[in-house]
Amino acid sequence: MFPSAHSRFIYFHKENSNPNYHAYDDTRFQVIMMSGLPGSGKDTWIKENLPEYKVISLDELRQEMGIEPGGNQGEIANAAKSLAKEYMRAGESFVWNATNLNKQLRGMLIRLFAAYQAEIRIVYLETSWLELLRRNKTRTEKVPEKVLYRMKNRLEVPTVVEAHRVDFIVN
């Protein structure tokens, strides 16, 4: 129906857009936004599929900054956004590695990335609940099971209208 992925993206992200309008693709670089519960395989997928990309990992920033998971997450988010802006100003592609569990949070980031002319790709990973719990037990930074359960209940699977491209990977 849409002339291009960029035209579809523009249609769903700008008011009063026409689905037949062939939008000029002014994207300059790519941002890959990971999405999925802890233990779904995001880090492994990045290493196997995008080893050459720079990665902004909120988990790694949390560790580097010495902030506990229950601590001030705003500082981590601000540091991550600052790094992302640096990459985007330079026109460098990168991976935004976080859980990105709900549409509202993804939307805020997508608007930021689009403002810098990014082509946005969401990679959503999913695995069975039992496998998720098994992987969590072997993690260095384990997530309490009740927290995982809460996250699972808040999860909103991305839709194809959120980005230029959305990949669904079930493993």
Model-predicted segments: where are they?
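Generic beta-sheet signal
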Residues: Q30-I32, E92-W96, I120
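Conserved substrate/cofactor phosphate-moiety recognition/catalytic segment
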Residues: D43-F94, L101, W129, L133
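Short glycine-/polar-rich loops that comprise or flank the Walker A/P-loop
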Residues: A90-G91, Y116-R121, V161-V166
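Conserved phosphate-donor/acceptor-positioning beta-strand/loop module used by diverse small-molecule
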Residues: Y116-R135
